[in-house]
From Swiss-Prot:
This is V-type proton ATPase subunit C 2. InterPro entries: ATPase_V1-cplx_csu, Vac_ATP_synth_c_sf. GO terms for biological process: positive regulation of Wnt signaling pathway; regulation of macroautophagy. The keyword Amino-acid biosynthesis does not apply. Kidney and placenta. Belongs to the V-ATPase C subunit family. GO terms for cellular component: cytosol; extracellular exosome; lysosomal membrane; vacuolar proton-transporting V-type ATPase, V1 domain. Residues 292-319 are annotated as: Disordered. GO terms for molecular function: identical protein binding; proton-transporting ATPase activity, rotational mechanism. Keywords: Hydrogen ion transport, Ion transport, Transport. Subunit of the V1 complex of vacuolar(H+)-ATPase (V-ATPase), a multisubunit enzyme composed of a peripheral complex (V1) that hydrolyzes ATP and a membrane integral complex (V0) that translocates protons. V-ATPase is responsible for acidifying and maintaining the pH of intracellular compartments and in some cell types, is targeted to the plasma membrane, where it is responsible for acidifying the extracellular environment. Subunit C is necessary for the assembly of the catalytic sector of the enzyme and is likely to have a specific function in its catalytic activity. The keyword Transport applies.
Length: 427
């Protein structure tokens, strides 16, 4: 499953034993894979400031998740015919999202823990706001390009009455630069081909004999040329209409046709450059983080390997990719990493608010093995940690019991700190 539960309990002896009981039960019952989730010590400040920060982090969490989902969808749209490979591009620091979450390590360089918590949160908020602003401008430019290209493509996909003719006709099909003669294009229904050949010369005076030629046809009819004197154009149009022949209003302008062809070629080139299908396939299965080793303490599977890549490897894999796809990959990674740091901050703040000072709690990441086991997993957690809040635990088991002074829906409150992480970003 791509679902994770991030929980915390006090770090005293009694609750560490409760965590061990939880791990034993969930392991034996095959309910979840559990991993300790390392969160550094932050400058706490006042409890009042933490209350305000808790609300701000909740909003930032929602915003960050929305942003990475939009970015994931943008990758889908850019890749178009290669949608099956989208997941390979949605990485965090060069590894798949599940590996990054289960091997999470706080980025001390990017978010120094010596700063006040409010400063750390502000740094993340500004980073995400900038990514969103860039995303809007880049996707707007791409969508404009895509729309312009689609409009041009529609012109070449209609029937003979509406489609552009610049890719069909050629200079040789027309009498050009003549003071007296002009070549018209006439759409003739397929059942009327024979009638056209027999009658076009007599539809009006001054039609050049044997001047008709079939240029192209679709399932409904054909496009024929006919050359005549300019002064009988209107008379010819009238007679043609009476015989179910339609004169297509078109005059060969070499410069205009060349301009239209160049515009189509330019748009196709610009769109292709945003995502090139020749991009190098992403490598999988690398087992080291080069510049900073991933340090994890698995509760359920101590032999589970960490995965990672060097920055140089990630850069080499980006060769051949268009600028928009490359930007989306890099900034999706940045936004996702920021999002998981927000989760860590929320656990820290809520744990201090709920368990008090001095700071002493243990965070654990649980990955339910299957959807059908989540109800049983929740029952195990509520049973193991019910001592943390007897009133809340009782109300969870009995929905009719209200918690005095607690405004949350009882179904959203648990005796332990709990946050949900959903990695199903393309659903």
């Amino acid at each position: 499953m791509s679902e994770f539960w991030l929980i915390s309990a006090p770090g005293d002896k009694e609750n560490l034993q409760a965590l061990e009981r939880m791990n034993t039960v969930t392991s034996k019952s095959n309910l979840s894979y559990n991993t300790k989730f390392a969160i550094p010590d932050f400058k706490v400040g006042t409890l009042d400031s933490l209350v305000g920060l808790s609300d701000e982090l909740g909003k930032l969490d929602t915003f960050a998740e929305s942003l990475i989902r939009r970015m994931a969808q943008s990758v889908v749209e850019v890749m178009e015919d290669s949608k099956g490979k989208v997941q390979e591009h949605l990485l965090a620091n060069g590894v798949d999202l599940t590996s990054f979450v289960t091997h999470f390590e706080w980025d001390m360089a990017k978010y120094p823990v010596k700063q006040p918590l409010v400063s750390v949160v502000d740094t993340i908020a500004k980073q995400l706001a900038q990514i969103e602003m860039d995303l809007k401008s880049r996707t707007a430019a791409y969508n404009t390009l895509k729309t312009n290209l689609e409009n041009l493509e529609k012109k070449s996909m209609g029937n003979l009455f509406t489609r552009t003719l610049s890719d069909i006709v050629s200079k040789e099909d027309f009498v050009l630069d003549s003071e007296y003669l002009v070549t018209l294009l006439v759409i003739v229904p397929k059942p009327n081909y024979s009638q056209w050949q027999k009658t076009y010369e007599s539809l009006s005076d001054m039609v050049v004999p044997r001047s008709t030629k079939l240029i192209t046809e679709d399932k409904e009819g054909g496009l024929f040329t006919v050359t005549l004197f300019r002064k009988v154009i209107e008379d010819f149009k009238t007679k043609a209409k009476e015989n179910k022949f339609t004169v297509r209003e078109f005059y060969y302008d070499e410069k205009e046709i060349e301009r239209e062809r160049e515009e189509m070629a330019r748009l196709l080139s610009d769109k292709k450059q945003q995502y090139q299908t020749s991009c190098v396939a992403l490598k999988k299965g690398s087992s080291t983080f080069p510049d900073h080793k991933v340090k994890v303490t698995p509760l359920g599977n101590p032999d589970r390997p960490a995965a990672g890549q060097t920055d140089r490897e990630r850069e080499s894999e980006g060769e051949g990719e268009g600028p928009l796809l490359r930007w989306l990959k890099v900034n999706f990674s940045e936004a996702f990493i920021a999002w998981i740091h927000i989760k860590a901050l929320r656990v820290f703040v809520e744990s201090v608010l709920r368990y008090g000072l001095p700071v002493n709690f243990q965070a654990v990441l649980l990955q339910p093995h299957k959807k059908s086991s989540t109800k049983r997993l929740r029952e195990v957690l509520n049973s193991v940690f019910r001592h943390l809040d007897e009133v809340a635990a009782t109300s969870i088991l009995d929905a009719s019991v209200e918690i005095p002074g607690l405004q949350l829906n009882n179904q959203d409150y648990f005796p332990y700190v709990y946050f949900h992480i959903d990695l199903s970003l393309l659903d």
